[in-house]
């Protein structure tokens, strides 16, 4: 940047450098996607093609930044886990948040055009995302965070599945369906689906019930201070070349995490 007498204005800029040696989770969320889904006539209660667009945009982000170890997505939301030793953008909060939000926004549009060539995106209703970042100090916090998001996915999907079944198959208005579901718990909704419509919720697709987990999979070598510089470089190279695999399974129990210890290094 050229020197000038006006450069003093940079003194007003402030950077928030996030705590070192802590886990970072960046969560991106669609802005106004309720209206967006109505505008472009998403299938109800779930649009598998729209989920594919979101999942592919998230994969593109992971491919761009090897420090992202895993991601969890549901609907128009995605959470990205950055490894504890991550130094991406010097851990500057504003840089991370703005980059993730803009990257997902443009990649969502790119993937949309591939998946929905028959649905032209209009200027009046563009897909945009905001982002936030949270610092977590322990493995327990990370696991509890992703458990929270997956439980939320289940609760929302069961409600939406029941709501739209009442509307589409039961002939109710949206207000009538809301009133019928008012005060119900999960067992009530399951019983309603099965007794009134012959739908066993357990047979619904796992992607809808459990969301999408993206994982950087590679031959694991434990990182640590005892590794030589060459060994550390080899591990970093493996991480960059790692395949990004998609799963729809339980991440609340121990199995998923025990099989992938590198995620929480």
UniProtKB/Swiss-Prot annotation:
GTP binds at residues 29-34, 75-76. Mg(2+) 2 binds at residues 29, 76. Mg(2+) 1 binds at residues 29-30, 76. The keyword Protein biosynthesis does not apply. InterPro entries: Thg1_C_dom, tRNAHis_GuaTrfase_cat, tRNAHis_GuaTrfase_Thg1, tRNAHis_GuaTrfase_Thg1_sf. It holds the Pfam family Thg1C. One of its GO terms (molecular function) is GTP binding. Binds 2 magnesium ions per subunit. Keywords: GTP-binding, Magnesium, Metal-binding, Nucleotide-binding, Nucleotidyltransferase, Transferase, tRNA processing. Adds a GMP to the 5'-end of tRNA(His) after transcription and RNase P cleavage. This is tRNA(His) guanylyltransferase.
């Amino acid at each position: 940047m050229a020197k000038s007498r006006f450069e003093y204005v940079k003194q007003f800029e402030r950077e928030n450098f996030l705590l070192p040696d802590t886990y970072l989770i960046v969560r991106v969320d669609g802005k106004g996607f309720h209206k967006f889904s109505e505008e472009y006539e998403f299938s109800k209660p779930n649009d598998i093609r729209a989920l594919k667009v979101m999942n592919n945009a998230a994969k593109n982000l992971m491919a761009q930044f090897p420090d992202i170890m895993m991601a969890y997505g549901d609907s128009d939301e995605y959470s990205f886990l950055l490894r504890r030793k991550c130094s991406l953008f010097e851990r500057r909060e504003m840089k991370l948040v703005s980059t993730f939000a803009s990257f997902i926004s443009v990649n969502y549009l790119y993937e949309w055009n591939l998946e929905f060539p028959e649905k032209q995106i209009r200027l009046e209703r563009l897909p945009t995302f905001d982002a936030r970042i949270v610092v977590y100090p322990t493995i327990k916090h990370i696991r509890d965070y992703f458990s929270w998001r997956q439980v939320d996915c289940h609760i929302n999907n069961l409600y939406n599945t029941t709501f739209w079944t009442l509307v589409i198959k039961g002939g109710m208005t949206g207000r009538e369906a809301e009133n019928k579901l008012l005060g119900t718990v999960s067992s009530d909704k399951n019983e309603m689906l099965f007794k009134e419509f012959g739908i066993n919720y357990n047979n619904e697709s796992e992607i809808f019930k459990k969301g999408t987990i993206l994982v950087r999979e590679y031959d694991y070598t434990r990182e640590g201070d005892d590794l030589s510089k060459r060994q550390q470089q080899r591990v970093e190279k493996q991480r960059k070349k790692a395949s990004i695999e998609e799963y729809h399974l339980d991440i609340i129990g121990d199995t998923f995490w025990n099989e992938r210890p590198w995620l929480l290094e």
